[in-house]
Amino acid sequence: VIGGQECARDSHPWQAAVYHFSDIECGGVLV
């Protein structure tokens, strides 16, 4: 992310994770 900044804790509660079996491969957050 270019020009990004930290966000306040719990301000973006919608998170996603992509699993391959039991390993997390990628993740993201809805902003």
Swiss-Prot record:
Enzyme class: hydrolase
All copies of domain Peptidase S1, residue ranges: 1-31
Domain of life: Eukaryota
Reaction equations catalysed: Preferential cleavage of Arg-|-Xaa bonds in small molecule substrates. Highly selective action to release kallidin (lysyl-bradykinin) from kininogen involves hydrolysis of Met-|-Xaa or Leu-|-Xaa
UniProtKB keywords: Hydrolase, Protease, Serine protease
Gene Ontology MF terms in the entry: serine-type endopeptidase activity
InterPro entries: Peptidase_S1_PA (IPR009003), Peptidase_S1_PA_chymotrypsin (IPR043504), Trypsin_dom (IPR001254)
Coiled coil residues, start to end: none
Example GO BP: proteolysis
Presence of keyword Hydrolase: yes
SUPFAM superfamilies according to UniProt: Trypsin-like serine proteases
Enzyme Commission number, as recorded: 3.4.21.35
Protein family per UniProt: Belongs to the peptidase S1 family. Kallikrein subfamily.
Function: Glandular kallikreins cleave Met-Lys and Arg-Ser bonds in kininogen to release Lys-bradykinin.
Protein name: Kallikrein-1
Species, as recorded: Cavia porcellus (Guinea pig)
